[in-house]
Structures are given as structure tokens and as C-alpha cells.
Amino acid sequence: MSNYYDVVDIAPGIKRINSSENAACDLIIGTKKAALIDTGLGLGDLPALVKSITSLPLIIFNTHCHCDHIGGNGQFTQSIYMGKEDIPTCSYSNSVYFRKSMMEHRDLPENFDEEEYLGRGFGHLIPTNEGDTFDLGGLTLMVYDAPGHSSGSRAYFIPERKIIYVGDSVLRTVLVFGYGAASRKTYIHTMDKLLKLPFDKILASHSYNPLQREDMERCKRVAELADYETGEPFENPIRDGETARIC
């Protein structure tokens, strides 16, 4: 199982957990507690990996409700913090349909139990809101509402390391607004707010390496230039029953 994950040191106490799932998780290790941000698809034994790195009490956070970020929630016994607006949609985004689709074309680990995986829940969720602060001992995790990619997306800022975790709010490829997303105007407001924070690095879930402030500025510009509201609709090639638009 150790070969399934690739753990990268980003900064003192900050570790990025990559895998073939292409949905990174992040471990923040203070002197008193550790925090895990997102649990990926949950195809590997993430709890065992975390325990091999730290024995500190663990707090778990989700950036948003999509199954490639909460797929491993059910592997943990701890309660998990998530934006309150996203909690009602977890049953949909964590459905067997989406889990099966996420398994396709993946390098599954040895001894992978498909039946257990498809029947796994998404854990006991606790709503978190902007202004919530968690003292890990020498490192502080600050919560910011970040609606856009989903209505309940959250960003997590570590001021001592000038690092911000954004989930899927910032991507290097294209902005995707699917089921449960907030409006384009709301997303632009989120970017404006987060850009005021004094961060140097952005840890985005689908980027192997840290992103820079310019990447967030670029995403904001794309959202400003897009014309989704009057764009030409077409059938979503990824999710049945949804309509996408050419902007």
C-alpha cells in the first residue's frame, strides 16, 4: 500500500498526498494535532498511510462534497468538517453511479474491495463556516467560505506557511460549474476575497505541484470573460441529464 501513495513535503509540517486517483489530499502536522484536507477517491488505505506519518490526534476537513474529495471519508472514525451548504448533496455526489465512474481506468491497489467501496458512506459530517479557526500547535487552520465550484466549497488558510487550500476552486485547465455550483458572480466574489489573503502557494486538489497567485487571478479572469448565462447549451458528455454550455 505504501507504493500506492506519493507523499511530498511542501513546507515544514505540510505534506501533499498524491496518487493515481489524481485527487490530492493534504496533511498538516502541528505540535498538538494534525489536519487532513480531503480524503480523495478512497481507493487506497488512507488511514493506514496517515497513521504511518503521525500519531497526533487527527481533524479531517473536506473542501467540498464531490466524490473524488470525500470518497475516503467512510474509512475514518472521526467526524469530518464540511461546508454546510454541501452536506445535503453528499448522497447524490457519493452515489454508486459516481463511485463506479470514478473507478474506471484507475490503477486500483492490491486487495481492493469493490463491494466495500461501493457501499461505503461519507462519514459523520459537521458543518463549518468562515471564521472557524483550529489551533494545531504552531500552525493555525483558518476556514473561509469559497462558493463557486460548489455552493458549500471551503478554503483553508495556514497563515504561518502562507499556504491556502482551495479544492477545485482553482484549476490550471478549465473552470467547471456542475450540479450544486454557485453562480459565476458568486465565484468571482470568492476569488476577490481569497486574493486579499497573504498566501504564497495554492494547493489545488487536481494539481500535483503548488500553484501560484497568478493562477487564481487567471481563474477569476476566465470567469469574468465567460458568458455562461447566454452560451449555447449542449448535452453534458460526462453526466447524464445535465446541460452544459459553450461560453
Protein language model features and the residues they cover:
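Short, hydrophobic/aromatic-rich segments at coil-to-beta transitions
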Residues: 10-16, 131, 140-142
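Metallo-beta-lactamase
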Residues: 34-36, 41-42, 133, 140-234
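Short coil/loop residues immediately preceding or within conserved phosphate-binding loops
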Residues: 23, 123-125, 131, 138-141
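C-terminal regulatory/interaction regions
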Residues: 232-247
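Short glycine/proline-enriched coil/turn segments at helix->beta-strand junctions
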Residues: 31, 54-57, 73-79, 159-161, ...
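Active-site HxH/HxHxD metal-binding segment of metal-dependent hydrolases
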Residues: 43-133, 221-235
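Short Gly/Pro-enriched turn/cap motifs at secondary-structure boundaries
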Residues: 17-18, 123-125, 145-147
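Conserved beta-strand hairpin/beta-sheet module of binuclear metal-dependent hydrolase folds
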Residues: 3-52, 155-171
